């Protein structure tokens, strides 16, 4: 999500010129990361170890979730942002999809289809349908 000066702490406002000099003016101000696995329960969130308080990781699937099958997902990004950071988000700046085997030495393959932003996350999740109208 874009950096929002009006929502930034004093310290964040002091640091921002350095962040922009090192990483660019469009460097996100807040980051939500949805992950499969981890030690927390599904739905729980925790501070992103790479971004500190500016990022939140949210567990979507537990270790041991069946492989080789489609897993429809729907999230309420707006509410997750509010829960994580305490204020309303502006429109997202970037969407990234990736996978990481956490240095396990394994090879993995995954696919994504029907990625979309909808007015309501509950409509597609309840039917398992990954298409949007």
Which role fits each region the language model picked out?
Residues 1-53:
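Extracellular/luminal beta-rich ligand-recognition
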Residues 95, 110-117:
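Extracellular beta-strand elements of beta-rich domains used
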Residues 67-105:
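Extracellular beta-strand ligand-recognition surfaces/modules
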Residues 4-8, 103-108:
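Short, surface-exposed beta-strand/loop "edge" segments at domain boundaries and coil↔beta transitions
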Residues 27-31, 39, 60-77:
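Trp-centered recognition loops
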Residues 2, 114-123:
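Short beta-strand-to-coil "C-cap" segments at the C-terminal boundary of structured domains/repeats
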Residues 123-133:
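A cross-kingdom marker for long, charged
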Residues 44-68, 80:
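A mid-sequence, solvent-exposed acidic-amphipathic segment
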């Amino acid at each position: 999500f874009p950096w929002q000066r009006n929502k930034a702490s004093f310290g964040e406002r002091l640091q921002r010129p350095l962040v922009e000099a090192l990483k660019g003016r469009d460097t996100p101000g807040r980051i939500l990361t949805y992950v499969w696995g981890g030690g927390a329960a599904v739905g729980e969130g925790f501070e992103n170890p790479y971004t500190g308080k500016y990022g939140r990781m949210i567990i979507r699937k537990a270790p041991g979730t069946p492989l080789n099958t489609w897993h429809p997902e729907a999230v309420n990004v707006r509410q997750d942002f509010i829960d994580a950071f305490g204020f309303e988000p502006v429109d997202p700046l970037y969407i990234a999809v990736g996978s990481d085997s956490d240095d396990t030495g394994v090879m993995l393959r995954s696919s994504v289809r029907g990625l979309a932003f909808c007015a309501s996350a509950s409509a597609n999740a309840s039917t398992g349908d990954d298409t949007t109208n």
